[in-house]
UniProtKB/Swiss-Prot annotation:
Inhibited by carbenoxolone and phenyl arsenoxide. Its EC number is 1.1.1.105, 1.1.1.209, 1.1.1.239, 1.1.1.53. The lineage of its organism: Eukaryota, Metazoa, Chordata, Craniata, Vertebrata. It is found in: Microsome membrane; Early endosome membrane. The keyword Isomerase does not apply. Keywords: Endoplasmic reticulum, Endosome, Glycoprotein, Lipid metabolism, Membrane, Microsome, NAD, Oxidoreductase, Signal, Steroid metabolism. NAD-dependent oxidoreductase with broad substrate specificity that shows both oxidative and reductive activity (in vitro). Has 17-beta-hydroxysteroid dehydrogenase activity towards various steroids (in vitro). Converts 5-alpha-androstan-3-alpha,17-beta-diol to androsterone and estradiol to estrone (in vitro). Has 3-alpha-hydroxysteroid dehydrogenase activity towards androsterone (in vitro). Has retinol dehydrogenase activity towards all-trans-retinol (in vitro). The active site is at residue 176. This is 17-beta-hydroxysteroid dehydrogenase type 6.
């Protein structure tokens, strides 16, 4: 019995490995649009796909980021300035992409732009602190997708949305986790709706990686600003010692982030170039062996594990 079961599992993984190794033809003729290319995953992916001969359309937030990327890549790669929080910027970028791809359409749309800071407890935030997180991570992503979807449909191409392991299990992260849960839901619904048009949607779920977004000093600096602006009754409820411990723990964990960004960009590249891309990619060892397995545990057990791993607020019950 066990022999047959192990054999079946082995054959399944062998078949999956073979299918996923099949590569889309004529990659050199395919256009890929990537948001958030100033640094981090987007920047590395743009260079990676450029080296592979694909036609990369890289969206950067700043002209400085765009210029630095152009200096590191071939003449095939083109850049455009895009602020995903501004509708007029998205409309202009869509027209720019349309002029370049023509009747071929857009093979790949990679929604990579994202923000993390400030990193705090939900009660500490003001609307002006958390709204930008939603505007970039979720609203911007949906608007870019809807605006460019007709170009992707024309190419029967791919949409790759960058979520997070914290979009599968909300251990911490305040509104960052909330925004990434939204990305997961949007991507799942979108995948169902566009599959009849030959469009495939993949979700990338990175663990903890060292990028500008996870810069420890900048994160703590912005977290302190949120705390300082919080009402006095909230500060008294948690206590200064609790906040200091929270900052120390956050900084310590951010310092552990992996520097191997290719673990993420390789997943993105596979989603764009394999004839059989995965629906979800868990990128990073912490995502594969901690966050994702934790998401399958009973909520009561996860709550207990979190409760014993952190300190108590000053006015805890």
């Amino acid at each position: 019995m066990w022999f047959y079961l192990v054999t079946l599992v082995g054959l399944y993984h062998l078949l999956r490995w073979y299918r996923e190794r099949q590569v889309v033809s004529h990659l050199q003729d395919k256009y890929v649009f990537i948001t958030g290319c100033d640094s981090g995953f987007g920047n590395l992916l743009a260079r990676q796909l450029d080296r592979r001969g694909m036609r990369v359309l890289a969206a950067c937030l700043t002209e400085k980021g765009a210029e630095e990327l152009r200096n590191k890549t071939s003449d095939r790669l083109e850049t455009v300035i895009l602020d995903v929080t501004k509708t007029e910027s998205i409309v202009a970028a869509t027209q720019w992409v349309k002029e370049r791809v023509g009747d071929r359409g857009l093979w790949g749309l990679v929604n990579n732009a994202g923000v993390l800071q400030p990193f705090a407890y939900i009660e500490w935030y003001r609307p002006e602190d958390y709204m930008p997180i939603f505007q970039v991570n979720l609203i911007g992503l949906t608007q870019v997708t809807i605006s460019m979807l007709f170009l992707v449909k024309k190419a029967r191409g791919r949409i790759v949305n960058v979520s997070s392991a914290l979009g599968r299990v909300a251990l911490f992260g305040g509104f960052y986790s909330c925004s990434k849960y939204g990305v997961e839901a949007f991507s799942d619904v979108l995948r169902h709706e566009v599959q009849d048009f030959g469009v495939k949607v993949s979700i990338i779920e990175p663990g903890s990686f060292k990028t500008e977004m996870t810069d420890a000093e900048l994160t703590i600096e912005r977290t302190k600003k949120v705390w300082e602006a919080a009402p006095e009754h909230i500060k008294e409820s948690y206590g200064q010692q609790f906040f200091d411990d929270f900052c120390s723990t956050t900084k310590r964990e951010l310092m552990k982030c992996s520097r191997n960004l290719s673990l993420v960009t390789d997943c993105m590249e596979h989603a764009l170039t394999s004839t059989h891309p995965r629906t979800r990619y868990s990128a990073g060892w912490d995502a594969k062996f901690f966050f994702i397995p934790l998401s399958y545990l009973p909520a009561s057990l996860v709550d207990y594990l979190l409760a014993i791993s952190r300190g108590k607020p000053a006015q805890a019950a």
